[in-house]
């Protein structure tokens, strides 16, 4: 079988997980797909089958993974599906939304990795996932509103994707209903306008580029959610009224220090660290610590949990299904080496929340 030949031929990649780890992630997520999406599940089952039966398909995936030295297996798996979805959406082909069986996907994956091989390989070698869901900013918005008592704020959003977050804060764009059994104040904080004097949204690609817009769209929706695209486009039109948020195009893995140190009252990193190599996460977190002021807030929202054995203080996981593994963490400028767990979300769509381990401690300081 192809997978046996792959494993037999593998050697160490300088401490990086081998391609067999990518295969494992495909199989794990075929059983527990992101968002519980049946189209993604059947796609990943088809990938597992083709890796076993089609040497050319397996070789294509393996070589693409091994040419991205800082890419984690989970990021590669996510990127693969987003690349497939991008190609399908760009061609206005949405039949895959209803695919519920690996047999539906197998001929399509073979076709795409043959006819669209160059395009798909370029995606796998050069792009990063850029999921942008405004609802994911509910945790950061609630934290900032609760802890800043209406004072004037300068906020940075590192890895902003489509730049929804800060513009939504400025315009007080409402969030969808959140089910919570513990904190009525959550809705009060979400409805409270922030006194945003200046916002800086940072990403390595410009969200106003038409091709980037298509890519963000492909990354931001599960197939079963594509019916919501029109609502998001309407929100984007509303966000164009923003006047206080500017965009900076910069690769956070290689920061240029163009941003002044200690300048911001809050820095947000929403769902972007999980896809990076551990050493790159440290670089990004160090930049966040550099630009926040000593009394400022660093807010990380991601698929992670506290782990003091990790250099970052957080262990990142593939908790994309409903197990409350998507969490909101707080660090401060004067205690930047420590994270407090504030909120635990049922999943990355943020419609159900529980108090985090450190919620009482953090919110004892709420205004």
What are these regions (language model features)?
Residues 1-66:
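Non-catalytic accessory regions outside enzyme or core folds
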Residues 60-152, 164-173:
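Class I SAM-dependent methyltransferase Rossmann-like catalytic core
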Residues 66-72, 93, 114, 146, ...:
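Class I S-adenosyl-L-methionine-dependent methyltransferase module
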Residues 152, 263-264:
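Local beta-strand N-terminus motif with an aromatic residue
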Residues 164, 213-217, 227-259, 299-367:
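Class I (Rossmann-like) S-adenosyl-L-methionine-dependent methyltransferase catalytic domain
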Residues 223, 253, 273-277:
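Short acidic, S/G/P-rich loop/turn micro-motifs used as interaction or catalytic elements
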Residues 265-279:
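A short SAM/SAH-binding and catalytic strip from SAM-dependent methyltransferases
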Residues 281-297:
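A short glycine-rich, Lys/Arg-flanked "PGG" loop and its adjoining helix->strand segment in the class I
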